[in-house]
């Protein structure tokens, strides 16, 4: 189905350097993959509607709910830097006026 020359060309286009052993290995692997696609193309899909997924899925998310943290002090202890009762974070916006 695919020969070593085609594998060499694919490797060249992908800018891959492969050994002769890898050429043989990839020739066999790519031939198997292409044979599988041939088998799939023989399936009768006339009554199968086009789809992008095999199963219908939806984005399942949980609702957000606020819950108080048991200990504010313990939470602040975990911060790399703090200022009073707040986390101190690096400044990301330039506040210098020009």
Curated annotation (Swiss-Prot):
The record, for InterPro entries, names: Asp/Glu-ADT_sf_sub_c, GatC
Please name the GO terms that the record assigns under molecular function: asparaginyl-tRNA synthase (glutamine-hydrolyzing) activity; ATP binding; glutaminyl-tRNA synthase (glutamine-hydrolyzing) activity
Catalytic activity reads: L-glutamyl-tRNA(Gln) + L-glutamine + ATP + H2O = L-glutaminyl-tRNA(Gln) + L-glutamate + ADP + phosphate + H(+); L-aspartyl-tRNA(Asn) + L-glutamine + ATP + H2O = L-asparaginyl-tRNA(Asn) + L-glutamate + ADP + phosphate + 2 H(+)
Say if the entry is tagged with keyword Protein biosynthesis.
yes
**What UniProt keywords are attached to this protein's entry?**
ATP-binding, Ligase, Nucleotide-binding, Protein biosynthesis
Catalytic activity, EC: 6.3.5.-
GO BP annotations listed: glutaminyl-tRNAGln biosynthesis via transamidation; regulation of translational fidelity; translation
> Domain of life, per the record?
Bacteria
Q: Mind telling me which HAMAP family this protein's record contains? A: GatC
Subunit and interaction comment? Heterotrimer of A, B and C subunits.
The UniProt function text for this chain reads: Allows the formation of correctly charged Asn-tRNA(Asn) or Gln-tRNA(Gln) through the transamidation of misacylated Asp-tRNA(Asn) or Glu-tRNA(Gln) in organisms which lack either or both of asparaginyl-tRNA or glutaminyl-tRNA synthetases. The reaction takes place in the presence of glutamine and ATP through an activated phospho-Asp-tRNA(Asn) or phospho-Glu-tRNA(Gln).
Family that this chain belongs to: Belongs to the GatC family.
Name this polypeptide is given: Aspartyl/glutamyl-tRNA(Asn/Gln) amidotransferase subunit C
Record the organism. Answer: Gloeothece citriformis (strain PCC 7424) (Cyanothece sp. (strain PCC 7424))
């Amino acid at each position: 189905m695919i020969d070593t020359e085609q594998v060499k060309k694919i490797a060249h286009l992908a800018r891959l350097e492969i050994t002769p052993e890898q050429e043989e290995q990839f020739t066999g692997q790519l031939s198997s993959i292409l044979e599988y696609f041939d088998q799939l193309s023989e399936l009768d899909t006339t009554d199968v509607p086009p789809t992008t997924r095999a199963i219908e899925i939806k984005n399942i998310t949980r609702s957000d709910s606020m819950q108080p943290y048991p200990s504010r002090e313990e939470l602040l202890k975990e911060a790399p830097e703090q200022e009073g009762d707040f986390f101190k974070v690096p400044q990301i916006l330039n506040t210098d006026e020009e």
